[in-house]
Amino acid sequence: MAVDFTAVEAVDPTRVAEATRRLEATTMAAGGGRASLGELAAWGGWLAACQGRELPAALEHVTLAVVAGGSSTTPSVSVLAEDSLSQVGELYSSGRSPVAAAAVAQDVRVEFIDANAAAADQLSTEKASPGAEPGLEEWLAAGAAFADAESDKGTELLLLGDFGPGTTTAAATIIGAICGIEPVKVIGWGSGIDDQGWRRKVAQIRDGMFAVRDVRTEPREILARVAAPHIAVLTGILAQAAIRRTPVIFDGVGCAAAALCAQMLAPTARDWWQPASPGTEPAIVPALGALGLSPILPTGIGLGQGAGTLLALPHLRLATQFAEGGA
């Protein structure tokens, strides 16, 4: 059964504007000039509106979800090791991941999600036939289930990142197809490919875009044909988080591709998201442009795994601290 993502309530722009003005007023009362907080007030206003408050409240329950997987259409391009997923997963489970350590230092809970395993778990709950393999709906449902679980736990802000071989190729294919951009303008160097790898990557993106040329406005079909489970799981998380009124900061080209698909599945879902940065992959900027979203940070880093969201989080927390101090 297809997951329904249509029940999204838009964030009221009037409430965003009012909360922004209130936050600016707190600093004016303390000696600041008009609009002295700049974009910080706008981010705080957005957060307050998502929280249903007049001013943004402290973020005490924040989760970083790193969704990992690969794409069956792009196995030969990435220079990542074949067992990179299990290697990175082990770093997270053993507490030796630098990204996880940085998250914990900011009082952020960390979840590492293997997209295929999560979808397989979802399939088991559906009482599928023996030998059945997870597909698109299981990937989307796994993402939605995670977003529901986080909302039920009281998560106040969700940080999203991606990881996996072939992520940049699959994401560039999706973004190029939806935005109508030629392959050479969305391709990046990904995991550190050489010139020969770049040429192969262009060919794979070109072939992938050709394969979805007739379904450019159908996100489910695009996700199914590109066959990148983690991007589909991210799509489910982003769409369902909006339904559950959980604000999200995302980072990375895989997340950007998922955001495009999620917005198509759940109109106005983008109201609940903020991109952390423009990243380092060329496909991210046109994706954010199509979404009408501006990143919190002016520059990005190429590490992935949501590292950029950990750079952006202090900005939102600073906005809540200004609100608390001026209340």
Q: Whereabouts are the PLM-identified features?
A:
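N-terminal loops that bind phosphate or other acidic moieties
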Residues: 1-327
